[in-house]
Amino acid sequence: MARIAGINIPPHKHAEIGLTAIFGIGRNRARKICDASGIAYSKKIKDLTDGDLEKIRVQIEQFTIEGDLRRETTMNIKRLMDIGCYRGFRHRRGLPVRGQRTRTNARTRKGPRKGAAALKK
């Protein structure tokens, strides 16, 4: 099993798909990494040589991924909440941030419905 950036990449998947197991790498970025490394998208992870894996590691080091990316995202949201802007307020209240309606829908962000009894209290 190949290990890249502290993540075990599924060996039976194609290189393009397997790289998406790393947080911060989607299909588009995985294709760019494969192109820069000279690896075919359809090549299975288990068929990659150590040299190929090292080329991929070198390419991935150019991007912010995994823990660093999660930390950066969290810090950006925290900064918005600290400066007291509208977006920070919406994050703090657990409501949609990008202008979506909340009278109906928005259940993903607001959580499960509160019954009529809970609203009367």
From Swiss-Prot:
One GO cellular component term: small ribosomal subunit
An annotated GO BP: translation
The keyword RNA-binding belongs to this UniProt entry's keyword annotation: yes
Domain of life from the UniProt record: Bacteria
InterPro entries assigned: Rbsml_uS13_C, Ribosomal_uS13, Ribosomal_uS13-like_H2TH, Ribosomal_uS13_bac-type, Ribosomal_uS13_CS
Keyword Ribosomal protein carried by entry: yes
Region annotation Disordered: where it falls in the sequence: 94-121
Gene Ontology terms, MF aspect: rRNA binding; structural constituent of ribosome; tRNA binding
Keywords: Ribonucleoprotein, Ribosomal protein, RNA-binding, rRNA-binding, tRNA-binding
Alphabetized PROSITE patterns for the sequence: RIBOSOMAL_S13_1 (PS00646), RIBOSOMAL_S13_2 (PS50159)
Signal peptide residue numbers: none
Function: Located at the top of the head of the 30S subunit, it contacts several helices of the 16S rRNA. In the 70S ribosome it contacts the 23S rRNA (bridge B1a) and protein L5 of the 50S subunit (bridge B1b), connecting the 2 subunits; these bridges are implicated in subunit movement. Contacts the tRNAs in the A and P-sites.
HAMAP family, per database record: Ribosomal_uS13
Assembly information from the UniProt record: Part of the 30S ribosomal subunit. Forms a loose heterodimer with protein S19. Forms two bridges to the 50S subunit in the 70S ribosome.
Family: Belongs to the universal ribosomal protein uS13 family.
NCBIfam families: uS13_bact
Protein name, as recorded: Small ribosomal subunit protein uS13
